[in-house]
Amino acid sequence: MTDSPTAGTPYGTLPPASPLPQRRPVSLPRLAQMREAGEKITMLTAYDATFAAVADAAGVECILVGDSLGMVCQGLPSTVGVTLEHMAYHTASVARGLHRVQGTAWLIADLPYGSYAESREQALRSACQLMQAGAHMVKLEGGGWTAPTVQFLVERGVPVCAHLGLTPQTVHALGGYRVQGKGDQAAQQLRRQALELQDAGAAMLVLEMVPTPLARDLTQALPRCHTIGIGAGSGTAGQVLVMHDMLGINLGKNPKFVHDFMRDAGSVRGAIEAYVQAVKQGRFPDDALHAWN
């Protein structure tokens, strides 16, 4: 058996890549061009080779190997139990899937709980492990206290995506899965943190469960940092969902900000293509249904 990009295996076949002339590798400059042109950025989580390859073939620009794998794949009650070794394993699996189909997606991997808070040096060691596994960028959660770490990583050639609003690694300190940034004081704090992270060099910023007007204002205030919303309304530069949520195959009730794209699509690839088109065309999220004002 050959190891060509579209070779079959005894256990299934990864989807073929589109013709190469139609596929431009996603990069930070390209994401900046998309934003300048007003084109929304699409992102989904993936934790294995097959789902990553299908997402890439369906046109998703960014794939996130999220520490949400702890809840989705491992059955943990939160993301806190996910280790760096878990993240490296799944990142390598996703990277191999993209390689096999000549994928072009930008690959982001979460730095898990306890892998970057001790020191900037610890963060760099952890980031290097994920980059060596195949990530193009690492994501970390936290406010202004992470800005020195972000700057340290960026100066050493590690692209960084920050994460504000609801930060699942600290959900116990936040008092549960609640909307963040409500009220003037909380909104001002989020804005200050976002600007600090942009100044530190963060190229992307996930905004999770943040009121729509605040997320829109932050997006306008961050020209060098692409905002990716999840439960943050339609005014961000892009959107992200957990793959299993948008396919309707989670074990619980979907969060308010999720739409089940599988319900009408009939196939995994069809559902992902529907998600991409809905985001691109401004039909998802619907601020009246999937967000907080």
Curated annotation (Swiss-Prot):
Instruction: Supply the name of the protein.
Output: 3-methyl-2-oxobutanoate hydroxymethyltransferase
One Pfam entry name: Pantoate_transf
Binding residues annotated for 3-methyl-2-oxobutanoate, in chain numbering: 67-68, 110, 139
Originating gene: panB
InterPro entries attached to this UniProt entry: Pantoate_hydroxy_MeTrfase, Pyrv/PenolPyrv_kinase-like_dom, Pyrv_kinase-like_dom_sf
Its UniProt pathway annotation is: Cofactor biosynthesis; (R)-pantothenate biosynthesis; (R)-pantoate from 3-methyl-2-oxobutanoate: step 1/2
Any one GO MF annotation of this record? 3-methyl-2-oxobutanoate hydroxymethyltransferase activity
What keywords would UniProt list here?
Cytoplasm, Magnesium, Metal-binding, Pantothenate biosynthesis, Transferase
Enzyme class, one word? transferase
Q: Give compartment(s).
A: Cytoplasm
* Residues annotated for Mg(2+) binding in this entry: 67, 110, 141
- What does the UniProt function comment say about this protein? Catalyzes the reversible reaction in which hydroxymethyl group from 5,10-methylenetetrahydrofolate is transferred onto alpha-ketoisovalerate to form ketopantoate.
SUPFAM superfamilies per record? Phosphoenolpyruvate/pyruvate domain (SSF51621)
State how it assembles.
Homodecamer; pentamer of dimers.
| Co-factor(s) | Mg(2+)
What positions constitute the catalytic site? Answer: 208 (proton acceptor)
Originating organism: Acidovorax sp. (strain JS42)
